Each structure stands twice: as C-alpha cells, then as structure tokens.
Amino acid sequence: MTPGEVRRLYFIIRTFLSYGLDELIPRMRLTLPLRLWRYSLFWMPNRHKDKLLGERLRLALQELGPVWIKFGQMLSTRRDLFPPQIADQLALLQDKVAPFDGRLAKAQIEEAMGGLPVDAWFDDFDIQPLASASIAQVHTARLKSNGKEVVIKVIRPDILPVIQADLKLIYRLARWVPRLLPDGRRLRPTEVVREYEKTLIDELNLLRESANAIQLRRNFENSPMLYIPEVYSDYCSQNMMVMERIYGIPVSDVAALEKNGTNMKLLAERGVKVFFTQVFRDSFFHADMHPGNIFVSHEHPENPQYIGIDCGIVGSLNKEDKRYLAENFIAFFNRDYRKVAELHVDSGWVPPDTNVEDFEFAIRTVCEPIFEKPLAEISFGHVLLNLFNTARRFNMEVQPQLVLLQKTLLYVEGVGRQLYPQLDLWKTAKPFLESWIKDQVGIPALTRALKEKAPFWVEKMPEIPELVYDSLRQGKYLQHSVDKIARELQVNHVRQSQSRYLLGIGATLLLSGSFLLVNRPEWGLMPSWLMVGGVVVWLVGWRKTR
C-alpha cells in the first residue's frame, strides 16, 4: 500500500470506530489478534452511543465522502443484505456536496469544446452552479445558435483518481467480510462492490447518459405521461452534457402540486404505468427514479405529465426475464405459490436441482402473511424483496437487472403513495401485465414473429435450393461413412469373437497340459506338447485383440 492509501485507510478505520461500527462484527467472530488490535485503539471510542446503529452507519458514510455516500445509496436498495432499520437509514443518504469552483467548470467546458471560449457557444453562462453532486455539477446558459435555455453538466475535475483509490480500499474491506460475518460468504461482498464499481464508472461517462436520455425521449415521444428533455448531442462529450432546461414542480413537493390543481390520483397512477411501460414495452427503464430526478409539468395539471432527468443509470430485461417477472406477479397475487416456485426454477434464477416442494413451502411461509393486508396496501417492491430473499436461501444467484428493477419499483411506489395514499398498484398494474402476457402468446404473437422474420427469410430464399443440394450431398457422404463404420464394426465384432474363442482354447490346452504333466507322467511328451500348443493358440488369440 502507498503512504496515501495507508493514510486514507487510517481515516476510514478511525471514522468507523468513532461511530461504533465495530458492533457490526459479532464478538464470536473476532480472533484474538483482532481483539487485541481493537483494545489497542482504546483512544478511538464510540462517540455516538446515543444513536442507533443504522443512523451511525449513515453518518459515518456521509463523513467519508461522495464515493461512500453513493455506495451506501446502492446498499440501501439491497435489502436482502441488511435488516430494515439499517436499509431505511441508508436510503436517507443525500448525494449533496459543496460545489467546486465555477471557473474550473468553465475551463473544463472550454477544453471539451476544442479550446474555444465559452461565449463562442453559449450566452448567459452562469458561473454559479444550479446544482452540485458528488460526480458532477450543473450550470445554466443559452445556446448561441438558437437562444434556447440549456443546462450544462460537467464531471468534477480529478474525480477519477479519488474514486479509484477509494474503490481499491472498499475491495480490501469486502474481502474481510466473509471472515468476520457469519453470513458473509452468502452476501457475496466482492460481487456487490463490483456491481457498484460498474455503476459508478458508467456515471462518469456523460456520453452514455446522453445516449440513455435520447433513447428514453424517443420511447416516450409525444406521450402525455412522461417528458424527457432534449439532449444537444453536438455539444456532448465524455465529461460534458448539454440538454434542454426544464421548469417543473418537484414530485416530492405535494403542497405545490395541490396548489397547482394537479390531479393527484391520475398522476400517481401514471407513475405506475410509466414504469411498467418502460419495463415491459421498451425493455429499457430509468433506474434512478428517486424524487430528486422527477418533476411534474406546470402545464395542464388536470392531465399531469412527469418530467424525468438524470438518466445515468438505466436497466433492461430480456424477453425471458420479462415474461417470468410478469407471470410471477400474477401467480403471487393469485396465491399460486407452486407456480411462483416453478417459474424461479424454469427461469434459471435458482439451480435446476432445487426441490420445488420445499421452495413452494418457503415462499408460502414468507408471502402468505402479506395477504393479511388489504390488496391496495400490498407493495410490489416488497413482494419482489420477499421472493428474492427466500430464493437466496435456495442459492439464487444475484440478478443485477432484477436488483435495479426492485429498487426502481420501490421508488415508484413510494412516490405514488406519497402523491395519492389510496393508490392501488395491483389494480393499476394487473390489466397492463395480463394484456402484455396475452400479447406474447397465441396467434397474434405468432403472426408478429413471422412478420419480424419475413425479411430474413425472403433474403435467404434464393439460397435454399443450394442448401438443400448441399444437405443431400452431405447426407450421401454421411451415409457412405456410416456404412463404412458399420462394416468396420462388424469386422471388429467377428475378430473379437474369434479372439475370445482362441483365447479360450489356448487356456484350456494350457491347463490340460499342466494337469497331465503333474498327474500322468507316464504319458511322456504329450502334456508338454499340449502346453506348448496352448501357449501358441493363446498368443494368436491375444494378437487378434490388438
């Protein structure tokens, strides 16, 4: 480790101990050297004994800085790893840090634009940031070409070395988790860190975020439900993104929405429909839909429209995952736990040798109490969480796309019920899911598949006669080869039969000669000749087996 890494590790350990986070490690798992090491740090006591463990963990991560804050935010979505009281506290982590100097942002923009001054491309550039987070910050301006208001998002300078250094230390700590926690190996800490690293590195590439925003905008073009601001691709680079500036009401500001006369019931239901449309129609969903990234248009409040920003994190499901997920939801709400268990096995989410009866019983035990609530109060996100937690006991592998989906679903539910507490998610989602499943099977689905494949088959049609001829010719050669192999096998079979016959005769002559030599010495040389003949016949038979 470099001196810088040692200093950083010391700061991390001091922070963890000052918040009493060594309580996360069961005493029985502390080896003697670790106990002595902890006692030697008596001058680093827990200074926050009045706070609960979850709150102390949240405060410690905030003190460690942006990389750890974002790590905590990601961990808050993995409720299979932590008890609710800790996961709830991690969900409160706010990715808000002090802005960096606007002059640095300006210099970075000029570098991205080929060294030209900012006013060559933008008017009214505001040196003061509109918003600031751990990875990037945003400035406002107007496009010189058309006068449109835009926001310019720039990556923090020199953030990559900081992220790489902290990730290296997080990996080191993750390797200790299986040794220190009884359930550490099942938690797969290294996989969790690897997943976080991928998400974080993706967020550093604003070209990726630009492409995501363009795709989402195209998917919801002219939609009354969701608006994605326009991205000005000509101005975008890996470290800079320029997009349309929007004005809306934060979705968390319920009072302002009500004051604007917003139809709250319709707004809440549209949030659910937007989510399921992204997942099942488009297979491409905004996976960071927390309240800070969602606004509501001021216009036509009786027909409200969401505005989505910050498309750095997206998720996608393949066709099989979508079908299994939809059927899982429907089977669960029909209380068909056998079907739920079979779907998990069929999808490959759990090993194929899983005992379906045991799995069904485990799902029933965990999920049946949920139905003690009214249907309108049942949380889709917690249904998924319960199913995944149960499946993990049966060695379900981590499915990153499903983890993202479950996190997003919890956000959508939370926002929806904040807007309209009586929101019945199942009533809103069931027709959508049933319609989607119906659309995937039967004559319409077959017709659609044939239409999709028709251009391919039309293109390949001229090649079919040649392919048939080649197949017939290959078949002829194959038949010739098969006949040849059959003849060789037959010859080998005859040879093996002869060999066994000769070996038997040789052994018989050898044994007979030996017997006569011992018991009938008066027979003279006859026994010896029998033995010699037996050896010769046996050797001939043995040679035929080679």
UniProtKB/Swiss-Prot annotation:
It comes from the Bacteria. Pfam families: ABC1. Disulfide bonds: none annotated. Keywords: ATP-binding, Cell inner membrane, Cell membrane, Kinase, Membrane, Nucleotide-binding, Transferase, Transmembrane, Transmembrane helix, Ubiquinone biosynthesis. It is a multi-pass membrane protein. ATP binds at L130, A131, S132, A133, S134, I135, A136, Q137, V138, K153. One of its GO terms (biological process) is regulation of ubiquinone biosynthetic process. This is Probable protein kinase UbiB. Is probably a protein kinase regulator of UbiI activity which is involved in aerobic coenzyme Q (ubiquinone) biosynthesis. GO terms for molecular function: ATP binding; protein kinase activity. Pathway: Cofactor biosynthesis; ubiquinone biosynthesis [regulation].
